[in-house]
């Protein structure tokens, strides 16, 4: 499944695509970046 994420509402299919919507609401390319979490919301492939 895909979920809308970030200010632009981009659809993301993987954690790595868009993190989990960081505090600023901006999609980031890596879940390892500061401010991003993979445990809060589990996106499905």
From Swiss-Prot:
<comment type="similarity">
    <text>Belongs to the conotoxin I1 superfamily.</text>
</comment>
<dbReference type="GO" id="GO:0017080">
    <property type="term" value="F:sodium channel regulator activity"/>
</dbReference>
<keyword id="KW-0800">Toxin</keyword>
<feature type="modified residue" description="D-leucine">
    <location>
        <position position="43"/>
    </location>
</feature>
<keyword id="KW-1015">Disulfide bond</keyword>
<dbReference type="InterPro" id="IPR012624">
    <property type="entry name" value="Toxin_19"/>
</dbReference>
<keyword id="KW-0964">Secreted</keyword>
<keyword id="KW-0872">Ion channel impairing toxin</keyword>
<keyword id="KW-0738">Voltage-gated sodium channel impairing toxin</keyword>
<protein>
    <recommendedName>
        <fullName>Iota-conotoxin-like R11.10</fullName>
    </recommendedName>
</protein>
<dbReference type="GO" id="GO:0090729">
    <property type="term" value="F:toxin activity"/>
</dbReference>
<keyword id="KW-0208">D-amino acid</keyword>
<feature type="disulfide bond">
    <location>
        <begin position="18"/>
        <end position="27"/>
    </location>
</feature>
<dbReference type="GO" id="GO:0005576">
    <property type="term" value="C:extracellular region"/>
</dbReference>
<feature type="disulfide bond">
    <location>
        <begin position="5"/>
        <end position="19"/>
    </location>
</feature>
<dbReference type="Pfam" id="PF08088">
    <property type="entry name" value="Toxin_19"/>
</dbReference>
<dbReference type="InterPro" id="IPR013141">
    <property type="entry name" value="Conotoxin-I_CS"/>
</dbReference>
<keyword id="KW-0528">Neurotoxin</keyword>
<feature type="propeptide" description="Removed by a carboxypeptidase">
    <location>
        <position position="45"/>
    </location>
</feature>
<feature type="disulfide bond">
    <location>
        <begin position="21"/>
        <end position="36"/>
    </location>
</feature>
<comment type="function">
    <text>Iota-conotoxins bind to voltage-gated sodium channels (Nav) and act as agonists by shifting the voltage-dependence of activation to more hyperpolarized levels. Produces general excitatory symptoms.</text>
</comment>
<feature type="disulfide bond">
    <location>
        <begin position="12"/>
        <end position="22"/>
    </location>
</feature>
